[in-house]
Every structure is written in structure tokens, then in C-alpha cells.
């Protein structure tokens, strides 16, 4: 569970205190760690654009927010990003499981997997792709500060190889 633990520790050390999550198989270990933490509010969402709305409200109420999701949800959330986050300069950290790329078993995930980086670029969301738990920890710490400097979301995109760190004994 080394990959998920690195993300969790970085979120904790960055004082992220409010998370909205949309279930994904790759995020299951991370979600379990977060759900066991009484100092982090985790609101499960049914769709990613719902998570963007919930986190916008939490930010306006003084919370330091993150959204945990898979990449297909960016396609569902472009209007919320453009009309809410861009217009009102709302920072949030995006922890994104990159589906539809390496090792993908579900054909329907592949188109969005190929387009995700371009979509994030069109949305002007800075995106980082950690390859190791150590790099993930450092980049999350950096990104959680940077999002406030730019008053906008910052994304971390985790591919299938990253989640293999959770399989290590």
C-alpha cells in the first residue's frame, strides 16, 4: 500500500482537511486510509461534477480541498471547471487515477485515457505525473501550495504503473 500511503501522508502533511471522492478501483486503498482519518472530512460523490460543486462550497467555507477521481470525470466536469473554478478562482487539488492507458481492461476507458492530458491543458490546469511514491509525496506538497498561488486547481495524474506500488508486500 506504499503508493496510497504516500498520497495520504502528503495530503495530511499539506493540511488537506476536506475531500470529495468518486469511487475508482485504483483509489480504494487511499479511500480506506482517508475514511479512517477522523481529521479529514470525506464526502463521497456520485459524479465528478458534483464533487467539484461540493469542494467549491467547502473552499468558500474555509476548507483546504481535494477531489479524488478517475480521469473520465474531467470530461463530465469541464463546465464546472470553466464556469465555477475559473470564474471564481477556486483552488483545489485533483488526485486523478489515469484509466484508459497502460494495462486498461475496459475498452470504454481508452478514449478518455488518451485525451485526458489534452483536456487538462485546455482547462489550463497544471498537471504533474508522479512515477514513485517519493515523487508523489513531494509533488503533492508542492501542488497543494501552488494551487493557492494560482487560485485554481492543480492535478496529479497517477497511471496504472504507479498503483502497482500498492501491490508490494
From Swiss-Prot:
Belongs to the ComD family. This is Sulfopyruvate decarboxylase subunit alpha. Signal peptide: none annotated. PANTHER family: SULFOPYRUVATE DECARBOXYLASE (PTHR42818:SF1), SULFOPYRUVATE DECARBOXYLASE SUBUNIT ALPHA (PTHR42818). Pathway: Cofactor biosynthesis; coenzyme M biosynthesis; sulfoacetaldehyde from phosphoenolpyruvate and sulfite: step 4/4. The keyword Lyase applies. Its EC number is 4.1.1.79. It comes from the Archaea. NCBIfam families: sulfopyru_alph. Keywords: Coenzyme M biosynthesis, Decarboxylase, Lyase. SUPFAM superfamilies: Thiamin diphosphate-binding fold (THDP-binding). One of its GO terms (biological process) is coenzyme M biosynthetic process. Involved in the biosynthesis of the coenzyme M (2-mercaptoethanesulfonic acid). Catalyzes the decarboxylation of sulfopyruvate to sulfoacetaldehyde. Inhibited by oxygen when heated in air at 80 degrees Celsius. The enzyme is reactivated by addition of dithionite. It catalyses: 3-sulfopyruvate + H(+) = sulfoacetaldehyde + CO2. Gene3D superfamilies: 3.40.50.970. It is an enzyme of class 4 (lyase).
